[in-house]
């Protein structure tokens, strides 16, 4: 460490200070509407405003968009639980994948690193393919459900074939592909179903519930391990 601060404290400062400064600048640099965006041309602005009106018209109308109404909305809590489950799988894999692979019988650090990279490489390809398919077919729900089922199935395979490294790694790969793809495929679903007024508080609550998994999931996996 330097200057009386430990290395991890410097890391927090170096990562946090630019973020806070950028957040302050965003107030002045970002426009609050299409009409005020100076970097958009007149035609681009008109197209975006038309799309925005169509999007708003397709969402359910609501006269109860208060914060209290958000907390009373069962759909928001259901979405929060779904997102919590997705994030639980993601955090568990991100934190524990190398350790799990080591417990399968691999001792060389380099080999563990290469094997750990396989699920993420395939997940990156799968994520692009699923996203492309969702846009092509204009469908979101099943493009979310299938990756989530893959994530659950992959973990079940990995657990039940822990004594067979090849099959266990296959299960972990399927789980990683499903969990990481579920993240980007999740958000269009609640965004499309919530009214404009409910979306702000609703999405914030869903996001907060999901990221509680970042605290709980690694501890739970470690406890089970």
Region spans (language model):
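Central mid-sequence intracellular linker of multi-pass
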Residues: 5-67
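A late C-terminal transmembrane helix in Major Facilitator Superfamily
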Residues: 191-225
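C-terminal transmembrane helical hairpin of 12-TM major facilitator-type secondary transporters
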Residues: 136-189
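Helix-to-loop junctions at the C-terminal end of transmembrane segments
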Residues: 125-139, 225
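Extracytoplasmic gate region of multi-pass secondary transporters
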Residues: 66-131, 183, 187, 214-218
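MFS 12-TM fold signature
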Residues: 15-22, 123, 148-155
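Cytoplasmic loop-to-transmembrane helix junctions
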Residues: 7, 111, 139, 198-205
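Small-residue (Gly/Pro/Ala) motifs that create kinks and tight helix-helix packing interfaces
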Residues: 1, 22, 26, 98, ...
């Amino acid at each position: 460490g330097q200057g009386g601060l430990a290395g991890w404290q410097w890391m927090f400062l170096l990562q946090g200070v630019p973020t806070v400064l950028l957040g302050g600048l965003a107030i002045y640099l970002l426009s609050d509407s299409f009409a005020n965006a100076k970097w958009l041309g007149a035609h681009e602005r008109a197209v975006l405003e038309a799309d925005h009106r169509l999007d708003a018209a397709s969402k359910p109308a609501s006269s109860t968009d208060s914060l209290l109404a958000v907390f009373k909305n069962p759909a928001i809590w259901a979405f929060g639980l779904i997102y919590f489950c997705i994030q639980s799988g993601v955090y568990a894999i991100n934190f524990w994948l190398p350790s799990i692979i080591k417990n399968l019988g691999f001792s060389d650090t380099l080999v563990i690193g290469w094997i750990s990279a396989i699920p993420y490489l395939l997940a990156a390809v799968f994520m692009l393919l699923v996203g492309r398919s969702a846009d092509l077919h204009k469908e979101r729900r099943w493009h979310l459900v299938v990756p989530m089922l893959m994530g659950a199935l992959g973990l079940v395979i990995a657990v039940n074939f822990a004594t067979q490294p090849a099959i266990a790694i296959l299960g972990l790969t399927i789980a990683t592909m499903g969990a990481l793809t579920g993240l980007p495929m999740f958000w269009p679903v609640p965004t499309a179903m919530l009214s404009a007024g409910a979306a702000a508080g609703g999405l914030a609550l869903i996001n907060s519930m999901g990221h509680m998994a970042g605290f709980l999931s690694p501890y739970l996996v470690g406890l089970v391990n």
